[in-house]
């Protein structure tokens, strides 16, 4: 009624608070008054046997997956597209170290950043290692981390001294196995080791020029990768010094191969074959009479 006045002494009371469901924070905690600090609250408790926000377990890195096929790149050579350096580590064999018996060489390949690229293994017979030593004919199979053969290197038997034009060494490079993509051919020179990097049509693409002395006592031994007219260096094959004890007791060597990142992957693969050929020609034990080979 308009103009109604409450009786004297009457004071209106506030309405009763609305009941808050169990598990929800109090309103005062969510909306603190002036001068009050907010009170941390907890969300509703999960039901027994369940977690509100399950946390993932530790992430375990799996094996590297296969490389994505690229147009214009031979199958299996995709790992060479984005790299400009390959580190080659030859595994030391205990039988070879302690008994002096020559075994099939095995290698591990990594990129300059440490990524595993694959494994390489020699295939040769005991008679060839016994009679021919470092000049033995052989086949090297390079497999990717998934154990798929992606590269095959074939070295025929060439008799005679490498300083004679009739005894020049050669390595054929196949990728995929069965398809020749290039050759490594030793170029005759009376004092300096030289090699020609040839394409599938045996046309020269690059040259590899080594030092006059390849002993490299205490230092790395470098073979320069040059243009086909030898006017400019574009890469390097380095046999890394492994220390006096290792060099004296084993012929397990470490190599570093450097090339331009935009170089054709086929040429990169042929340079890899040149690295293996250089290892056998200059840094492998020389064969001879006696027990210098063993079946592995």
Curated annotation (Swiss-Prot):
Cofactors named for this entry: Ca(2+); Mg(2+)
Catalyzed reactions: a cardiolipin(in) = a cardiolipin(out); a 1,2-diacyl-sn-glycero-3-phosphoethanolamine(in) = a 1,2-diacyl-sn-glycero-3-phosphoethanolamine(out); a 1,2-diacyl-sn-glycero-3-phosphocholine(in) = a 1,2-diacyl-sn-glycero-3-phosphocholine(out); a 1,2-diacyl-sn-glycero-3-phospho-L-serine(in) = a 1,2-diacyl-sn-glycero-3-phospho-L-serine(out)
Comment on pH dependence: Optimum pH is 5.8. Activity decreases at higher pH values.
Motif placement: SH3-binding 2: 21-27
Keyword Transport on entry: yes
GO cellular component: cytosol; mitochondrial inner membrane; mitochondrion; nucleus; plasma membrane
Extent of motif SH3-binding 3: 66-71
Domain notes: The Proline-rich domain is required for phospholipid scramblase activity.
Subunit structure: Monomer. Forms homooligomers upon binding to Ca(2+), Pb(2+) and Hg(2+) ions. Interacts with PDCD6 in a calcium-dependent manner. Interacts with PRKCD; interaction is enhanced by UV irradiation.
Stated family: Belongs to the phospholipid scramblase family.
The name this protein goes by in its record: Phospholipid scramblase 3
Organism: Rattus norvegicus (Rat)
Source species taxonomy: Eukaryota, Metazoa, Chordata, Craniata, Vertebrata
Gene name in the database record: Plscr3
């Amino acid at each position: 009624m308009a103009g109604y006045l409450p009786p004297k002494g009457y004071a209106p009371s506030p309405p009763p608070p609305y009941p808050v469901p169990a598990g929800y924070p109090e309103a005062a905690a969510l909306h603190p008054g002036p001068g009050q600090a907010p009170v941390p609250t907890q969300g509703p408790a999960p039901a027994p046997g369940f977690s509100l926000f399950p946390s993932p377990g530790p992430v375990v890195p799996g094996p590297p997956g296969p490389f994505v096929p690229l147009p214009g790149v031979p199958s299996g050579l995709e790992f060479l597209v984005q790299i400009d350096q390959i580190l080659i580590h030859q595994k030391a064999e205990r039988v070879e170290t302690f008994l002096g018996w020559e075994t099939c060489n095995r290698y591990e390949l990594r990129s300059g950043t440490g990524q595993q690229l694959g494994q390489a293994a020699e295939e040769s017979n005991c008679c060839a290692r016994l009679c021919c030593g470092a000049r033995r004919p052989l086949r090297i199979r390079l497999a990717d981390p998934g154990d798929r053969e992606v590269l095959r290197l074939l070295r025929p038997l060439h008799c005679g001294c490498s300083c004679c034009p009739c005894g020049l060494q050669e390595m054929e490079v196949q990728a995929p196995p069965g398809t020749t993509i290039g050759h490594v051919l030793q170029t005759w020179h009376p004092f300096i080791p030289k090699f020609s990097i040839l394409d599938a049509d045996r046309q020269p693409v690059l040259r590899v020029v080594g030092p006059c002395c390849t002993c490299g006592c205490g230092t790395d031994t470098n073979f320069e990768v040059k243009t086909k007219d030898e006017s400019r260096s574009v890469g390097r094959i380095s046999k890394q010094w492994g220390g006096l004890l290792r060099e004296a007791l084993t012929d397990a060597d470490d190599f570093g191969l450097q090339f331009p990142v935009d170089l054709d992957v086929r040429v990169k693969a042929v340079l890899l074959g040149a690295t293996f050929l250089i290892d056998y020609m200059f840094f492998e034990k020389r064969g001879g009479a006696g027990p210098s080979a063993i079946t592995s």
